[in-house]
Design a protein with these regions (language model features):
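Beta-strand-rich domains and repeat architectures in extracellular enzymes and scaffolds
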Residues: 32-34, 49-81
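Repeated scaffold domains used in trafficking and secretory/extracellular systems
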Residues: 62-66, 107-112, 150-159, 204-212, ...
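Blade-loop segments of beta-propeller domains
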Residues: 55-65, 91-118, 125-126
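Blade/loop signatures of beta-propeller domains
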Residues: 14-52
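Short coil/turn segments at the loop-to-beta-strand junctions that recur within blades
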Residues: 59-60, 97-105, 146-153, 197-202, ...
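Asp-box/WD-like beta-propeller blade repeats and closely related beta-sheet repeat scaffolds
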Residues: 108-109, 125-172, 177, 194-200
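Conserved blade-ending motifs and adjacent loop-strand segments that build the rim/top face
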Residues: 243-266, 302-329
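Short beta-strand elements that form the blades of beta-propeller/WD-repeat-like
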Residues: 24, 73-78, 119-125, 160-173, ...
């Protein structure tokens, strides 16, 4: 989410068939952001809670890096326990945690994506410089393909293509064909298109303020580069600017060249790091960092007006929403972590919550996935 590459022995070789992808010159929709306060507590006028999925407590998750829901299955990448797959009732189906050098084993997970059409779960292992393919049915190892370069920070599969977010090129300085942020491949190995040439000032400053750059929006795939405010919609053969998010007091591009201290930058009065970009039902959700806080925003794209921009979002009474983490079918969804639920239970008595939560153990249970549908306006 370019010059062509083929795989030969241990080295990727450049083919002459790669070409630049088309970046549309159409004008994006402007999204004007204004801060509305500490808390927005009228969420029930915008979203309604639909259902909850309590994940099986074994294995116990601790550091969730990415979630993807596809074909009635929930895939979670946890930095400690690996990739875990659940059904839509929260029951464990399988766990990928085979670390090692043997067949079917990986040394580390650097990125992953689900190819639902081929029933494949794909892991990028930087140490092995390989793509590892597993079955989404039972986690069974299928194959390994050598993938020396690029070194993607993120993978998405959409519309029959693999899309790679390629942050840096320091490991292949001389191969300028790959000095691009977004690369596309039909088979996962051979790069077919490239978009957005690397900028030297960002190569020298590898800090990434955004949690992700590729966003699965159910029927659409969105992409936003680090330190950028343009959200692009990815198509099979082009990318189209969809939104221009105008943040208050945005970070000047010149500051990146100064390579400021990361924590000082996040605590500064500048706005940066647009992330978690999800649009459904005429509503666009996203987050960014300013003054050391993460701000959540909701924008009505049909009426071109902001709904809110606040540090916290909640329902008027008992609140069970932390942030928007994705879209599945006709719903937004949110990962309710034990830490968040512990806080929510301290704010409101347990009897205010659905029965599912009355026996919830914040010390020994896994997160709950909550689904929300846009209120018909």
């Amino acid at each position: 989410m370019v010059v062509c590459l083929t795989v030969s022995c241990a080295h990727n070789k450049t083919s002459l068939s790669i070409g630049p992808g088309v970046v549309s010159l159409s004008s994006p929709q402007d999204v004007i952001v204004e801060m509305t306060g500490e808390t927005y507590d009228k969420l029930e006028t915008i979203l309604q809670q639909v259902s909850y999925v309590k994940l099986s407590a074994i294995p116990l998750l601790s550091r969730i890096k990415k979630i993807q829901i596809a074909d009635e299955r929930i895939y979670l990448w946890d930095l400690v326990v690996g990739i875990v797959c659940y059904d839509m009732s929260g029951e464990l189906l399988f766990q990928l945690n085979a670390r090692g050098q043997g067949p079917g084993e990986y040394t580390d997970i650097n990125a992953f994506a689900v190819n639902a059409s081929l029933h494949q779960l794909v892991i990028y292992d930087n140490m092995k410089q390989s793509l590892m393919f597993y079955s989404t049915e039972d986690g069974r190892f299928v194959k390994s393909e050598k993938f020396n370069k690029p070194t993607p920070a993120e993978i998405a599969y959409w519309g029959g293509y693999f899309f790679y977010h390629n942050r840096l090129h320091r490991n292949y300085q001389d191969d300028i064909s790959l000095h691009y942020y977004l690369l596309a491949s039909k088979d996962g190995i051979t790069i077919g298109k490239r978009y957005f040439k690397h900028e030297n000032n960002k190569e020298d400053y590898p800090f990434s303020p955004s949690g992700h750059n590729l966003y699965d929006n159910n029927s659409k795939l969105y992409y936003c580069r680090d330190f950028d405010n343009i959200v692009y919609q990815i198509h099979e053969d082009s990318v189209v600017p969809r939104f221009r998010i105008n943040l208050p007091n945005p970070l000047p591009a010149s500051m990146i060249e100064e390579r400021p201290n990361e924590m000082s930058l996040l605590r500064s009065g500048y706005s940066l790091g647009i992330t978690d970009i999800y649009e459904y039902g005429g509503l666009l959700f996203f987050r960014f960092v300013k003054d050391g806080y993460i701000w959540s925003c909701l924008y009505n794209v049909e009426e071109s007006k902001q709904v809110y921009c606040a540090k916290r979002i909640k329902f008027l009474d008992s609140s069970l929403i932390d942030t928007i983490d994705g879209i599945y079918k006709d719903c937004f969804y949110s990962i309710l972590t034990p830490e968040y639920l512990d806080y929510a239970f301290s704010e409101n008595p347990l009897e205010d919550y659905p029965d599912l939560f009355k026996t919830y153990d914040v010390e020994g249970d896994n997160p709950v996935i909550a689904f929300y549908r846009a209120v018909v306006r």
